Regions:
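Rossmann-like dinucleotide-binding domain for NAD(H)/NADP(H)
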Residues: 72, 78-164
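Rossmann-like dinucleotide/phosphate-binding beta-alpha-beta segment
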Residues: 1-71
Length: 164
């Protein structure tokens, strides 16, 4: 999607070789190599998830997937919580099957007291932020400015940000 493509472009601009996996099976119009899931897992140093939750992505990153990843791999789930199995991720981190994870979504939110991820106290292995971590004062101010401009344009009968 748009977010994944944006992240891929930034990574590419920093000199990363970008590959991707498409759970939908659709080949994107991007200059990156598409891999089958198992190859994608074996080759990736960093996996950044920006996918919707559906039958094909639910529990996609589970014990089987973590067993195929590099021990030095970092997993970022910025999509939907249930794409990653929290218990299996905890085990993978505790056993050194992957190096680290960064999450702004969880399998069940708000996080429950018995979530196994809470056992991991090492912030070099696991960082969890709210899904609204983008919500800096500047971002929220810009958002409100856009809302104001859209309302002002609408009351004048003007089209703004219209895709034709």
């Amino acid at each position: 999607g748009t977010i994944g493509k944006g992240v891929a472009k930034i990574a590419s601009d920093f000199g990363c070789k970008v590959i991707y996996y498409s759970a939908s099976g659709k080949t994107q119009d991007v200059p990156y190599e598409r891999e089958e899931f198992d190859e994608f897992l074996k080759k990736s140093d960093i996996i950044s998830i920006h996918a919707p939750l559906n039958d094909k992505t639910n529990n996609l990153f589970n014990k089987e997937a973590f067993d195929k990843m590099k021990a030095s791999a970092v997993l970022l789930n910025l999509g939907r919580g249930p794409i990653v199995n929290d218990a299996d991720l905890t085990e993978a981190l505790e056993q050194g099957k992957i190096a680290a994870a960064g999450l702004d979504v969880l399998g069940k939110e708000p996080i429950e007291k018995d979530n196994p991820l809470l056992r991991i106290k090492d912030s070099t292995k696991l960082v969890i932020t709210p899904h609204v971590a983008w919500g800096t004062v500047e971002a929220r101010t810009r958002l409100m400015d856009e809302v104001y401009e859209n309302i002002a344009a609408f009351t004048k009968g003007e089209a703004r940000n219209a895709v034709v």
